[in-house]
Regions:
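Short, N-terminal intrinsically disordered low-complexity segments that are rich in Pro/Gly
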Residues: 20-27, 52-55, 289
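Terminal accessory/targeting
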Residues: 10, 16-21
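Alpha/beta enzyme core
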Residues: 4-12, 28-53, 59-75, 84-212, ...
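Histidine-centered catalytic micro-motifs
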Residues: 21-27, 80-85, 212-225, 258-260
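C-terminal alpha-helical cap/extension of soluble enzyme domains
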Residues: 231, 242-330
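Short coil/turn segments at secondary-structure junctions
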Residues: 18, 50, 111-113, 283, ...
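An acidic- and aromatic-residue-enriched active-site/binding cleft used to recognize and process polar
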Residues: 144, 218, 263
């Protein structure tokens, strides 16, 4: 099946009413875990790297590890996605490396922290759309603004998406998928009070726009993982995420792409802490990264089943980026 445009994966999900997880990666073990889970459940998958991950691992190193995931899993539809690109240059770099999808987050200025205005968002998004579509690459953008800060991205303040503005934004930019803000946030501390999402906003946006909708900040922060982290020496009091039933309701109401990063970090960290606590003599990285990889595979497989992605890997004939170039450049 190999590398496919994210647009195809999300449109198939929209047609059949399921969600697709987009799982953030920083290293080999995370990529292997995600792909093993995709094979186990026969799920299409989006593997995504943030600018922070690409800086940490080096753009080329991480990019080629992601390509290895495609090569080693020919029966699985895989999209390679840039998460929270901040400029046309960041998108170009990902496209040049072979990514099949890029996100441009024009809801913030190029520093990834300062809130932008509508005009700025439209201009930077349109420039990325015009460039990416020449290469058959999918473009995701964001309207509204999530709270929280993760991987150096975020202003800390939230701004719920205005449905009419979302409609105009899609018309003004020609973007392929739209991330909206309905009350989720980045990081492990998503709610200060009641866990409330603006499902009414999601429903209104879904009525107005026809393209796939994306939900960022969608980790569930399972209590058992927080308890395990804290049991083995961590300090994460009060961490809370989005309940799975909320995510499943969002999928039913029209979300196709669900971003997951924090949960993967927690699964690996809890396992590594456990290994070092119970076996302090261990020093071979394989002795702690191996169990962490297994734990993450289990977590991702459970999400693929809960999102409804499982069993859909063989549903459709894959499109190539060359195919998409013809679609975009008619």
């Amino acid at each position: 099946m190999a590398l496919v445009p994210m647009k195809q994966i999300l449109e198939e999900a929209k047609k059949k009413g399921y969600g697709v997880g987009a799982y953030n990666v920083n290293n080999m073990e995370q990529i292997q875990s995600i792909m093993a889970a995709a094979q186990e459940t026969q799920s299409p998958v989006i593997i995504q790297a943030s600018r922070g991950a690409l800086k940490y691992s080096n753009f080329t190193y991480l990019g080629y590890l992601m390509k290895a995931a495609v090569i080693e899993n020919p029966t699985i539809p895989v999209a390679m996605h840039l998460d929270h690109g901040n400029s046309l240059d960041s998108a170009k770099k990902a496209i040049d490396l072979g990514f099949s999808s890029v996100m441009i987050d024009g809801s913030l200025k190029e520093d990834g922290k300062t809130p932008s205005d509508y005009e700025y968002n439209v201009n930077v998004t349109r420039s990325v759309v015009e460039y990416a579509h020449k290469y058959g690459v999918t473009v995701e953008a964001e309207i509204g603004r999530l709270g929280g800060i993760e991987d150096g991205v975020g202003s800390g303040s939230a701004h719920i998406t205005d449905p009419q503005e979302a409609l105009q934004f899609v018309k003004d930019t020609g973007v392929d998928a739209l991330a909206i803000a309905i009350g989720t946030s980045h990081g492990a501390y998503k709610f200060k009070g009641a866990k409330v999402l603006a499902f009414d906003v999601l429903q209104e946006v879904r009525k107005l726009i026809d393209i796939p909708i994306v939900l960022h900040g969608a980790s569930s922060v399972p209590k058992e993982l927080i308890d395990a982290v804290n049991k083995y020496g961590g300090k994460m009091p009060g961490a809370e995420g989005v309940p799975m039933e909320h995510l499943q309701k969002a999928i039913q109401l029209g979300v196709q792409k669900i971003n997951v990063d924090t949960d993967g970090r927690l699964a690996m960290t809890a396992t590594i802490r456990k290994v070092f606590t119970e076996s302090p003599e261990k020093f071979d990285p394989r002795d702690y990264l191996g169990p962490a990889r297994t734990a993450l595979q289990g977590l991702i497989a459970s999400k693929m089943k809960a999102f409804g992605t499982a069993g859909h890997a063989s549903d459709y004939a894959p499109l190539t980026l060359e195919d998409m170039k013809k679609v975009y450049n008619k």
